[in-house]
């Protein structure tokens, strides 16, 4: 049997090259079998791209990455035009191969020791008041990247004392306690970790992840920092039922999670998991009502909602759809 070719550091694998390395075989979608995108998912392009270009130039100048670009988020134009961005630290190559995600897979380079300072300076220059910091999975690092998160938060606050920081962290597989010890030295203002989907779909959608680990990460952080809101996000359209999603919401509340985002999965390419259905806005409204009933302090539920979409407004408890 042929072994997979050893990956070279810094080489990005995308699409077929990426998903060919997961345990569940994905048959590339043919155009005539792909579901037609409904009108409620049409995104209006901005009248001007000037602000988008300014933010992209600032990121390139400092060698930084935004998950908005790397994950092909449909809200990039809207968020960039509002002067907000979700920064992705620890490089743009992920050690996982989730077939719903458009971020590249491969062997990452060593963390950039200068990134925390460059990130803080960029945020200051962009005059941001609320930032989201996320990362790729770094299973190659002993702490999963936790120290780099803490370093970034510390440097950001040095130059931006009034800023609010939300972290969207990976699952720190096999090293939760060690990671939480480090993160506790520089806790964020909002702690976010996405469950992504219902547990029965993890094998196909989140190979290498574990539903209970993710719940435990959220709960253990909350036990250490009871005054910091915890948050999680889910996608719909991967074959789950509304009842399955409802149970995930109950599980999140049982693990003391207070904030929720729920949006529609969109297939990045024909080599990724197909969209099994487009969920109508009315069904998102029903799940929003359930989330409110269960006691979430804020639930953003709608087709175009993403974990970081208007995160500043979400943190203020304002309605986001």
UniProtKB/Swiss-Prot annotation:
Any one annotated GO CC term: cytoplasm
Record key words, sorted: 4Fe-4S, Cytoplasm, Iron, Iron-sulfur, Metal-binding, S-adenosyl-L-methionine, Transferase
Subcellular location: Cytoplasm
Co-factor binding details: Binds 2 [4Fe-4S] clusters per subunit. One cluster is coordinated with 3 cysteines and an exchangeable S-adenosyl-L-methionine.
Molecular function GO labels: 4 iron, 4 sulfur cluster binding; lipoate synthase activity; metal ion binding
Organism from which the protein derives: Shewanella baltica (strain OS185)
Domain (Radical SAM core): residue spans on this chain: 80-297
Top-level taxon of origin: Bacteria
Pathway in which the depicted protein is active: Protein modification; protein lipoylation via endogenous pathway; protein N(6)-(lipoyl)lysine from octanoyl-[acyl-carrier-protein]: step 2/2
PANTHER family according to UniProt: LIPOYL SYNTHASE, LIPOYL SYNTHASE, MITOCHONDRIAL
Cofactors: [4Fe-4S] cluster
The keyword Oxidoreductase appears for this protein: no
Gene3D superfamilies associated with the record: Aldolase class I
Main location: cytoplasm
Pfam families: Radical_SAM
Residues bound to [4Fe-4S] cluster 2: 94, 98, 101
Protein name per the record: Lipoyl synthase
């Amino acid at each position: 049997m042929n072994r997979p070719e050893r990956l070279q550091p810094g080489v990005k694998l995308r699409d077929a090259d990426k998903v060919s390395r997961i345990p569940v075989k994905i048959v590339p979608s043919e155009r005539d079998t792909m579901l037609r995108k409904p009108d409620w998912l049409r995104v209006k392009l901005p009248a001007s791209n000037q602000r988008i270009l300014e933010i992209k130039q600032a990121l390139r100048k400092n060698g930084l990455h935004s998950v908005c670009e790397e994950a092909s988020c449909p809200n990039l134009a809207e968020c960039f035009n509002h002067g907000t961005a979700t920064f992705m630290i620890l490089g743009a190559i992920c050690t996982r191969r989730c077939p719903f995600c458009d971020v590249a897979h491969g062997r990452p380079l060593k963390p950039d020791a200068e990134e925390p300072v460059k990130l803080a300076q960029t945020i200051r220059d962009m005059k941001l008041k609320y930032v989201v910091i996320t990362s790729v999975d770094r299973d190659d690092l002993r702490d999963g990247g936790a120290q780099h998160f803490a370093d970034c938060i510390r440097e950001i606050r040095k130059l931006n004392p009034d800023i609010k920081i939300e972290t969207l962290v990976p699952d720190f597989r096999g090293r939760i306690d060690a990671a939480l010890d480090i993160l506790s030295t520089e806790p964020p203002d909002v702690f976010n970790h996405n469950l992504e989907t219902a547990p029965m779909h993890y094998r196909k959608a989140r190979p290498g992840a574990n539903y209970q680990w993710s719940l435990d990460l959220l709960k253990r952080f909350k036990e250490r920092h009871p005054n910091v809101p915890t948050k999680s996000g889910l996608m719909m359209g991967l074959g789950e039922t509304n009842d399955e999603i409802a149970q995930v919401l109950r599980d999140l509340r049982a693990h003391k999670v207070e904030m929720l985002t729920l949006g529609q999965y969109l297939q990045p390419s024909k080599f990724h998991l197909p969209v099994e259905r487009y969920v109508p806005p009315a069904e998102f409204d029903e799940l929003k009502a359930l989330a409110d009933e269960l006691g979430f302090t804020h639930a953003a539920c709608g087709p175009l909602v993403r974990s970081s979409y208007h995160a500043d407004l979400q943190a203020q408890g304002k309605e986001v759809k």
